[in-house]
Amino acid sequence: MIQEEKEQYSSKSLEAGVDELWRASDAYALTRKKRLGSKRFFFVDGPPYTTGRIHLGTAWNKIIKDSVLRYRSMNGYDLIDRPGWDMHGLPIEVKVESILGFKTKKDIEEFGVARFTEECKKFAIGNMHEMTSQFKKLGVWMNWDDPYMTLKNEYIEAAWWTIKQAHEKHLLERGLRNVNWCPRCETAIADSEVEYADRKDDSIYVKFPLKNEEGFLVIWTTTPWTIPANMAVAANKDFTYAMVYALPAAVLEEAAMQAGLDHTTLVEHHSDGRPKPMRYSDKVAKMKEAIGEEKVKELYEKHGEKLIIARDLVDGVLKMGRYADYQVLKTMTGEELKGTEYVHPLADLIPCQKETEHKVYLADFVVGENTGMVHIAPGHGFDDFELGLKEGIRAYCPVKANGHYDDSVGAYAGMEIREANPKIMEDLRQRNLLLGATTIEHRYGHCWRCKTPIIFLTTDQWFIAVSKMKEDMLAEVKRVNWYPDWAGSARFYDWVNGARDWCVSRQRYWGIPIPIWKCEKCGSLDVIGTKEELERKVGREVPDLHRPFVDEVRLECECGGSMRRVEDIFDVWFDSAVASWATLHFPGRKDLMDWWPADFIVEGHDQTRGWFYSQLGAGMVGFGKAPYNGVCMHGFTLDETGKKMSKSLGNVVAPEDVVEKLGADTLRLYVLSQNAPWEDLSFSWEECGNINRAINIFWNVYRFPLPYMVLDKFDPAKVTLESVKGSLRVEDRWILSKLQAVIKDVDTYMATYELHRATRSIISFILEDLSRWYVQLARERTWVEADDPDKLAAYRVLYDTLVTTVKLIAPFTPYIAERMYQNLVRNVSAEAPVSVHMCDWPVVDSSLLDEQLNRDMDIARKIVEASSNARQKAKRKLRWPVQKIVVAAENPDVVTAVKDLSGVIGEQTNSKEVVVLAPGEANTELGVEVVPNPKLIGPIFKAVAGKVTAALKEADGRAVKKAIEEEKKYIVEIPEGSFDILLDMVSFRDVIPESLAMADFPGGKVYVDVTLSKELEAEGYTRELIRRIQDMRKEMNLNVEDRIKVEVYVGDEKVLDLVKSMKDYAAGEVRADTLDLKTEKPAAGFVKDWDVEGIPMTIGLEKI
């Protein structure tokens, strides 16, 4: 049978108990077993890196997934819900390097690759176990006994199979490409792995000497270290360029001083004598005047420099270079500038640059900024490399994997590139080729794992030719269902549209080895697709497919030569890219692929360029389609002010701290309901606390009827809804109808992954409909001692409402739902499903859904709220009854609602009578005040206007209004004569008497009669007395069924007499066998003094 819940809500003990229940009953396995063979729902988990403890964003991610999976399971779906773990790549390597104190790849080589990869494996597996425990404490149900792990051989085979497909479909290419490169990790990294942050860098303007004439091309760069690799200059064919003859400011200033120019003449003054800045152009004019035209000409011939700059940018560049004056010698188009030859500015220091031909090419990527020309180093830039391919420019890349120059750069050989910047700038300055230098702060790419600034290198890499599949990929993006739609139609579509060929090779150790063997003799390739294929070809078992073990495998080539595996491993994003078929154990098993593609994936919005993209690319390679049908994108978790959480800011909120303080259910319901999944979530302890209070209210609503049900031995198996149908009150029908509407809403929202709306709908139902309305209406019915049909109807409705609500909230707050279910259902029937999560999802019962009643009750509640507001104005507590309320309706819907629900409204407003006035019907209890219109009365009545106005104000407003409505006029009688008052000469204002209090609501006004009769006063004091006795019962920890005897001293004879008239009513309400009203204070039992509305009372209670 149902048990009473005596304890207050405690998340810690409740959740621990439910965890133990699930473990002991094997609830997860039984739940999944129940749905085997049903309609299918294939979910693929985006695998987190096993690099440490989970954070709030990871927790939110898994909570969303778990809630959707629980909902789908209750809706009858057979699920695939394997959790995934990303256990390879730089995320793991960098952590292990830090633990071991390594700084470079050389440290790893000296330590030993086998030992290093073993350390990585242990680190990844250890963290996986820790993170699994954390996820379980969030109530996440997944197939934790069989996760997919990217380090397992069967998973590695899924990646090998995919790359073999790429090879067979001519989508796998190797060649020189310009890639993002991390010099610390010494590997290529993908565009999606580049993290941008503000950084200060050198900003320099450099003069490149023309080869065949006097003058310079001027370029700008923020990477001085790329100057040694310069192979060309790019201009824009649509720009106009100018060759200017520029005179350095220092030369002109020195000549002016030698000419005897008094510097005081270079200062202007305000009218009051104060100095003011002189424009530099005016200073230049004065200096030239002082020097003389011939001398200026001589200065130009001796010191002038001929510079080629985009015409519109000349002034800015010359200001940067501190040139005082210039003349435009000629202009040219970009097309005319094409082919212009120049000499490398550091050719004397870099031997190979002496022998290289350098000239100007045209490129559309050159923009009208800085100088209008771009220095081209095909070895160190994507656009540069592409221009080099087009024009046949050599991709000279003198930088090694560790970010140091090689020996080909002469004077800079062996230097770290950024440490070489000052020397390069100084060498340019000594050659008078550094036009200007400063520093700028700009967004610059960094390695996603070690945070080192990236560089661009041209290296030999393995690529998947995304460019060959792009149109098909974009078509698939359109086919997939995106939640929200713009995540796919805008953000992801744009990313795919701009994507380059995918560099899938990495020069590291801990990852999936690229399964390509190359013949050392003839150079032919063999791409291996499975472990079995490799073992068949090598003739022995290969137990571990990682480095260095797989590196030791040699294959025999058809030419007789020996084939060695290429050293590279896969980009770690390629690991997770194959997750949707690796989850299904493919290619080892083919029978599960009819589940594919995934019905649902959900990850953060950063995955538009991460996992969403890599999966799409791999899916197109393997199967020619996207590996998912539905994608939901969620936001990031931020602090309360909207800032990113970071340890350095001290604003990190750990999920385990929230669980410890408020419970897993609170954290779950908070992150699900706070905002739409695709919006960023700014975590607030206060808002999270509000959700905890909502859960507490739900717990108390659940606890409320239990003592009465236990006392009355209520048996839901015997007291069915059908058996009490004839005793249902309108509020019973309403709460059941409202519940159907909530089921309908939740289903609608869950279909589009609007979990915030689904959870808010349930929370609102619990707080507003169930707790603050229905329970208040039903409370007194549960106190009836007799075996009353009305009470049983309330029990049954409460029971059904609670059980259904428990099922509705179960996917979102699984712990409290389970605890309530076990008491309300399992304690009633041992045949019921072991867990609430095994139950079928509630289905809308159309016979219970009454939309009109729902609308009427919404109106009734607004009327009750308005009545409460009016009472507050009159300082009349709700506990004190009023004779009546009058509802002045503004539309017919309000009239209908009041008539149909007058009993509910009367009970909730504590009024003896509820009166409704139809739209336009006058409230005769209101006074009517005449408001004369002076704009009409003055001009019409002129000299007597004041007396007419005074007469109107003194007249009976109701009579004036009636006369105008019926006779179209009202006649004012004054000594000067009779005057007709027409409708537009006056308006009317209601006058609320002191006996009424008024408040508005959407749909009309509510007037509360606050007149206090003797009978109402007696009831008011009696209700005050009852409340205090009930409080004392609670303090004595009495059970509902405990009987008491009461003695009451009332320190006012009048009030004593009033309470005596309702003594029997009070005794019944507090379950007192005797209630004696005395003139002396009680001494026996639990005695307490009270102040009741200014009247001293002393109450004594004794349990019988």
Curated annotation (Swiss-Prot):
A motif ('HIGH' region) lies at residues 48-58. Keywords: Aminoacyl-tRNA synthetase, ATP-binding, Cytoplasm, Ligase, Metal-binding, Nucleotide-binding, Protein biosynthesis, Zinc. It is an enzyme of class 6 (ligase). One of its GO terms (biological process) is isoleucyl-tRNA aminoacylation. Its cofactor is Zn(2+). It catalyses: tRNA(Ile) + L-isoleucine + ATP = L-isoleucyl-tRNA(Ile) + AMP + diphosphate. SUPFAM superfamilies: Anticodon-binding domain of a subclass of class I aminoacyl-tRNA synthetases, Nucleotidylyl transferase, ValRS/IleRS/LeuRS editing domain. Pfam families: Anticodon_1, DUF5915, tRNA-synt_1. CDD domains: Anticodon_Ia_Ile_ABEc, IleRS_core. Its main location: cytoplasm. Its EC number is 6.1.1.5. GO terms for cellular component: cytoplasm. A motif ('KMSKS' region) lies at residues 644-648. It is found in: Cytoplasm. ATP binds at K647. GO terms for molecular function: aminoacyl-tRNA deacylase activity; ATP binding; isoleucine-tRNA ligase activity; tRNA binding; zinc ion binding. PANTHER family: ISOLEUCINE--TRNA LIGASE, CYTOPLASMIC, SOLEUCYL-TRNA SYNTHETASE. Belongs to the class-I aminoacyl-tRNA synthetase family. IleS type 2 subfamily. Monomer. Catalyzes the attachment of isoleucine to tRNA(Ile). As IleRS can inadvertently accommodate and process structurally similar amino acids such as valine, to avoid such errors it has two additional distinct tRNA(Ile)-dependent editing activities. One activity is designated as 'pretransfer' editing and involves the hydrolysis of activated Val-AMP. The other activity is designated 'posttransfer' editing and involves deacylation of mischarged Val-tRNA(Ile). IleRS has two distinct active sites: one for aminoacylation and one for editing. The misactivated valine is translocated from the active site to the editing site, which sterically excludes the correctly activated isoleucine. The single editing site contains two valyl binding pockets, one specific for each substrate (Val-AMP or Val-tRNA(Ile)). This is Isoleucine--tRNA ligase. The lineage of its organism: Archaea, Methanobacteriati, Methanobacteriota, Stenosarchaea group, Methanomicrobia.
